[in-house]
Structure formats: C-alpha cells, structure tokens
C-alpha cells in the first residue's frame, strides 16, 4: 500500500475523523480563555513586572501552540471534503516542516519557561527587601533566554530531517527523529517534576520567612506576592506535569496494547495522545488559570488589607486607641515644656 492509499484509508476512518473534529473544536475553544487570561487578567494585574511579563510569555507560548493546532487540524478536517484524488490528502513537505517546528516549539518552550519562572521567584525571595524596585530586565532576560534555548533545541531536533516527502499527518514525527522525541518528552517530564516539588517547598519557605521578615511594609507586601505567585506557578506546573504524564502513559499504552484491540492504522492514529490529552490540556489550563488567579488575587488583597488596616474593636482596638491617646498627651506635654 502506497502513501496515497494509506492516507485515504486513515482520513475517512470514522474514529479518526471524530478525533480530528474533537481536537479542532477543543483547540478553537481554547483560544478564548487564553486570550482573556493574557489581556484582561495578567496584563492588568498588580504583580511585579518581571513575573507578570514571564506569565504573559508563558501563556502566549501556549496560545501559539493552540493556534498552530487550529491551523493543522482545520487542514485535516477540511481537506477530505475538498480532495479530488487520494494524494491530495497528503501534507506538503514545506508546510509539514513549518508546522512541525512550531508544534515542537509550542510543546517544549512553555516547559522551559516555567523553569525560568521558578528561577525568577527564587530571586524574588532572595532579594525580597528590595525586589519591589527591580526593573523589568530580569523577566525579559529569562524569557528571551528560555525561548532562545528552545529554538536551539528545535533546530537540533530536526537538524537531520530533510522533509522531502509528503506526510500523512502534521503530527507524525519522522522515524529518524522518533528517538529524539522520546528523549525530549521524558527529559522535560523529569525536569518539570523536580520543578514542581521545588515550587512546593518554595511556597513553604516563603510562608515561614514572611513571619520573620516584617521589618517594613514593602517587605511584607513583597513576601505576600511571592507566596501568591509561587502558588500560581506551582498550580501551572502541576497541571503541566499531570497532563504531560497522561500523554506519555496514554502513548505507551496505545503503543504496547493498542494493536491487540485496534485493528487498523487509522484506529491507532485516532487515539494518539497528541489528539486527546494535549488539546484538552490547552483548554483546561486557560480556564483553570483564570479561576485560580482570581482566587489568589482576592486572597492577596484580603491579606494585604489585614496588614495595613488598624483594628477598631476588641482588645487590639482598645490598645491602639490607648496608644494614640498617650501619644497625644506626650505631644501636648512636650509642647508645654
């Protein structure tokens, strides 16, 4: 069977078609919460400029991945309606090179950027007493450095690929790069799992030091922001690790057990993790991040308000009132002398 016959059998298989429609619709719906999060939540939030910039970079990278999915899955959904011959269903080599590069970048770059966010939060903890006045340069440097590293990673990933033959799917990594993809996925999962644990302990350390570093209002404010943003980073990291683990587990199960109950190549391709877990993650991360960010910001406002507001009732209120009266009498007494 040649490629034209194979892609024809795959493209019109019912299960495969359903998976393409699911992924396309999920990707389209993912755009809106991500745009809302970036434009109406992160852009106007009161976080330090460095961490705010990195969050915007991170979710913009995910948005790029989502838009890439919208284009390539729209191709796989629409072309079968328009194809005149079987070979029309094949993916052009030039388009395949472009969108596969963007696809790998969209998956790997957010996982490097989240490491940069952790590094920035560590710096914010170390320099908590003066970090309020730190310029945007740190966030820009970390964000650009993460993207340059990932671009180099993608370049070397496809270095030996010629992309001189049409492909059945945009998401079929060439056989010569298959081992690289496995290495990349497992390495990123391991690194991000360690990062998740590190973020958890970073929240604990921030909470402990917040009670000790109370020498100024600005320091207390910075420590409170450190706790809120590190919790948000921990949440993002957890969702990323969870879904990426599901993706790898799902892929291994299909690879090992799939041939036993999925009889055709089309059925095997239709239930690949890339068609299910990654689009679902892209949808959930936008919605869940909006919800958790709103919750954490309300928590931050309440705690900061409690820090700077005087109590007017109870024992604390009576003590504050007494101290204020004593200060007035001391001032009057000093004036008479």
UniProtKB/Swiss-Prot annotation:
UniProt keyword Plastid, yes or no: no
Pfam hit, one: 7TM_GPCR_Srb
Record InterPro entries: 7TM_GPCR_serpentine_rcpt_Srb
Molecular function GO labels: transmembrane signaling receptor activity
First and last residue of the signal peptide: none
Subcellular location: Cell membrane
Effect of loss of the gene: RNAi-mediated knockdown results in defective head and tail avoidance responses to Streptomyces and to dodecanoic acid. It also results in severely reduced calcium influx into ASH neurons in response to both S.avermitilis and dodecanoic acid.
Membrane topology note: Multi-pass membrane protein
GO BP annotation list: defense response to Gram-positive bacterium; detection of chemical stimulus; sensory perception of chemical stimulus
Residues annotated as transmembrane: 20-40, 62-82, 98-118, 138-158, 183-203, 234-254, 273-293
Any one annotated GO CC term: plasma membrane
Tissues in which the protein is found: Expressed in the ADL, ADF and ASH chemosensory neurons in the head and in the PHA and PHB chemosensory neurons in the tail. Low expression also observed in the egg-laying structures in the mid-body region.
Keyword set, alphabetical order: Cell membrane, Membrane, Sensory transduction, Transmembrane, Transmembrane helix
Function, in words: Mediates recognition and avoidance of Streptomyces species by detecting dodecanoic acid secreted by the bacteria. Also mediates avoidance of decanoic acid which is not secreted by Streptomyces species but this may represent an additional important avoidance response in the environment.
Family under the similarity heading: Belongs to the nematode receptor-like protein srb family.
Name of the protein: Serpentine receptor class beta-6
Organism: Caenorhabditis elegans
Taxonomic lineage of the native organism: Eukaryota, Metazoa, Ecdysozoa, Nematoda, Chromadorea
């Amino acid at each position: 069977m040649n490629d034209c016959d194979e892609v024809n059998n795959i493209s019109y298989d019912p299960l495969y078609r359903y998976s393409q429609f699911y992924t396309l619709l999920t990707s389209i719906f993912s755009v809106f919460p991500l745009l809302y999060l970036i434009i109406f939540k992160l852009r106007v939030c009161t976080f330090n400029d460095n961490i705010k910039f990195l969050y915007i970079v991170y979710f913009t990278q995910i948005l790029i991945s989502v838009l890439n999915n919208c284009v390539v899955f729209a191709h796989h959904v629409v072309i079968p309606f328009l194809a005149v011959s079987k070979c029309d269903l094949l993916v052009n080599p030039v388009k395949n090179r472009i969108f596969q590069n963007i696809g790998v970048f969209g998956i790997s770059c957010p996982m490097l950027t989240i490491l940069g966010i952790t590094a920035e939060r560590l710096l914010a903890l170390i320099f908590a007493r003066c970090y309020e006045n730190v310029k945007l340069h740190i966030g820009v440097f970390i964000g650009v450095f993460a993207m340059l590293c990932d671009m180099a990673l993608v370049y070397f990933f496809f270095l030996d690929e010629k992309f001189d033959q049409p492909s059945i799917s945009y998401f079929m990594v060439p056989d010569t790069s298959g081992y690289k993809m496995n290495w990349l996925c497992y390495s990123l999962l391991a690194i991000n799992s360690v990062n998740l644990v590190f973020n958890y302990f970073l929240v604990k350390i921030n909470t402990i030091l917040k009670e000790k570093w109370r020498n100024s209002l600005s320091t207390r404010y910075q420590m409170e922001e450190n706790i809120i943003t590190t919790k948000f980073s921990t949440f993002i990291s957890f969702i990323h690790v969870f879904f990426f683990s599901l993706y790898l587990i799902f892929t291994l199960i299909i690879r090992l057990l799939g041939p036993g109950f999925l009889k055709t190549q089309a059925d095997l391709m239709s239930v690949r993790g890339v068609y299910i877990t990654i689009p679902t993650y892209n949808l959930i991360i936008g919605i869940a991040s909006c919800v958790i960010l709103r919750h954490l910001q309300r928590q931050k406002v309440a705690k900061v308000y409690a820090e700077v507001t005087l109590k007017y009732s109870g024992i604390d209120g009576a003590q504050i009132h007494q101290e204020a009266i004593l200060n007035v009498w001391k001032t009057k007494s000093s004036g008479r002398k």
